[in-house]
Amino acid sequence: MSDAEKTAHKEQVRETVRVGYAAIANGQSACCCGGSCNAHDPARLAQAIGYSAEDLAKLPEGANMGLSCGNPVAIAALREGQTVLDLGSGGGFDAFQAGERVKAGGRVIGVDMTPEMIAKARKNTDFYQQRTGLANVEFRLGEIEHLPVPDACVDVVLSNCVINLSPDKAQVWREVFRVLKPGGKVSVSDLALLKMLPDTVREMAAALVGCVAGAVLVSETRGMLEEAGFSSIELTPKPDYVRNMQNWNDPLYRQIAEALPKGEEMADYIVSLTVEARK
């Protein structure tokens, strides 16, 4: 594949994801990362992966769209006064929770490449500010491969089931390293592969938007982090997320399972992965 063809392919992937998530933001689709092709309550999924009912009750209506595969906010152990960057911030689900933890002296910046998601998050900001009295969360339109954030200005980078959607994950990690302050922390939940998926699954558009087809091997994630310059890398597989999707008979996961070799299941291939690292 030539350089021009590679560039065209990356743009095609971005556009597929952008269109899929615009439909989700507009309420025209529920098939997305986090397995919410299913009609299950997003709150049920969120609680299954570590969010408390109390935290969920504080969120603006529509901020939780069932797009998560872990709880990076809890893993990050945020402190008052920190500056936090949320990659692929969607409707503000993690950004608003982070905002309450860093308080008035802190700041949260959400970045998303989908205009419809940015509009939704900014609308939700009014509710957040009225409830908390805080004006410390903002949302910026941009691609996570080219973050609209200066060098060395962020204490913690969060992301929840988003980096796998990028057609250039190595560039994402380089950008994360660039914007972090020395000693800054990565706290990410994402989907990763235990072994390579069959081509029939990787070529499914629904599986791409659903965060499956774009996932890479756990070992590849470690390699990209190391190449970007990170240290203290900890990768923790959490299989319960995929098992929950299977048990809830999620339509996307059922469709993918039907394309797998006989006798194999989703949990043999896919896992929720917690990524922690330092600059």
Identify the residue ranges that each predicted region occupies:
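N-terminal auxiliary segments of SAM/dcSAM-dependent transferases
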Residues: S2-A46
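C-terminal lobe and adjacent flexible extensions of AdoMet/dcAdoMet transferase-like proteins
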Residues: A4, E226-K279
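Conserved alpha-helix/loop element of class I SAM-dependent methyltransferases that forms part
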Residues: C37-T83, L87, D94-R101
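Class I SAM-dependent methyltransferase SAM/SAH-binding core
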Residues: N71, R79-H146
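Hydrophobic beta-strand segment of the Class I
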Residues: V84, V157-L158
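A short glycine-rich, Lys/Arg-flanked "PGG" loop and its adjoining helix->strand segment in the class I
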Residues: A170-K185
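Short, glycine-/aromatic-enriched active-site segment of Class I SAM-dependent methyltransferases
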Residues: A192-V212
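Short alpha-helix
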Residues: A213-G229
